[in-house]
């Protein structure tokens, strides 16, 4: 009897989660193919990715005849994957990256806020994000911001898991820290050092506030930095080799 009640409760929770996820899809997928370009930068990102696909050159980013490599290459690679799958002539193909970023952000934020505030409060937090006009707008624009936000949110969630962990296991000792550094590296490839700045600020603020020096060891900085460099360094090296940009040039 108790087992049946427990199974029914788990089934209801699963149904709630599925319904909630479907509810998330409605504002983010509406109008992706019918809304015209909303931003000057969106047109530039789309055109640059389109040229990347047409020329089959996935390193040398260009907007028309102008070299466009002041921002890292991650967003162009992500957009090109969706454009190759769904069609390079459809504006929605390039926007799916931002939509996916928005969905990942919502799902990670849901888990994040469950840990911090509990089940009921987490629904309020996520619902507030979902009805934000700015958030919905950004999920419809083929730019970097929403995808970057998803990796920053995921990285912060993993850092929280490391902070709260009190037991020894390969999951918390290696897999979660390495995953956090990988998310940090991908975030860097999307929009430069912004994800790194957020990570350093959060980490240093928590350590200064809590006096928990062990956290600096628990994030596995040695292996983490190696993983970070494996992701970031090849692009930096290639760009320097091709003399496309100077790393010190400010991002537009």
Give the ranges of each region predicted by the language model.
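Membrane-integral, polyisoprenol-dependent glycosyltransferases
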Residues: 2-248, 252
